[in-house]
């Protein structure tokens, strides 16, 4: 991808995350990126394609950062690293929740590309949790509860602010649930 396209993507992602998809127009993205409207439309035929491309780029970065953080761990240790990574994200000064959820919330039912990219992102996270918990009994239940707790914390900490006590309780609860359902793992 060209430097101009990268600049447009980076600018659009920043503006969408800080504001909203609906509230940010292509004129603002053009002005902030320093690219012309013609250049924007050379790489992205419309705003929906730009949103989809932003989500795809964000998903790629998200996956790489998370996998780097969890690197060289497996099983429960990897799961705990995955949880820790999310807890660190929730504490960032500019934390605004999940861009994928926000994209779906602001999209129309016909925006299947945006919905599909967002769904793929969430399925990937759930599959990663499944990979880390596959050696435990009641895997499906452990995965669904863990995934739902993480997703719930995204909303909770966005609205209420980060709470270290709640974060620790959730992480401890996940580990206690694994131990309770898998006494041989203690």
Ranges and model annotations:
Residues 109-134, 144:
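Amphipathic alpha-helical packing segments from all-alpha helical-bundle domains
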Residues 92-112:
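Amphipathic alpha-helical segments used for helix-helix packing
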Residues 7, 11-49, 53:
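Helix-turn-helix
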Residues 51-58, 65:
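Alpha-helical DNA-contacting segments of helix-turn-helix folds
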Residues 53, 67-92, 146:
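Hydrophobic alpha-helical connector segments
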Residues 147-166, 176-184:
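Amphipathic C-terminal alpha-helical segment
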Residues 80, 123-126, 130, 171, ...:
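An amphipathic alpha-helix signature
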Residues 80, 140-147, 151, 171:
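Short, well-structured alpha-helical segments
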């Amino acid at each position: 991808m060209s430097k101009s396209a990268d600049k447009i993507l980076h600018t659009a992602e920043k503006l969408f995350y800080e504001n909203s998809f609906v509230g940010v127009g292509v004129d603002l993205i053009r002005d902030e990126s320093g690219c012309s409207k013609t250049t924007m439309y050379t790489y992205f035929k419309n705003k929906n394609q730009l949103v989809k491309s932003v989500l795809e780029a964000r998903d790629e970065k998200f996956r790489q950062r998370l996998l780097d953080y969890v690197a060289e761990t497996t099983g429960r240790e990897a799961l705990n690293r995955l949880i820790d990574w999310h807890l660190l994200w929730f504490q960032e000064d500019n934390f605004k929740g999940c861009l994928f959820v926000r994209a779906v919330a602001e999209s129309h039912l016909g925006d299947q590309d945006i919905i599909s990219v967002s769904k793929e992102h969430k399925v990937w996270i759930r599959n990663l949790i499944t990979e880390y918990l596959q050696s435990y009994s009641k895997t499906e239940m452990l995965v669904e509860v863990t995934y739902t707790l993480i997703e719930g914390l995204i909303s909770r900490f966005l609205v209420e602010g980060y709470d270290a006590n709640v974060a620790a309780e959730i992480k401890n609860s996940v580990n206690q649930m694994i131990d309770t359902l898998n006494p041989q793992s203690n």
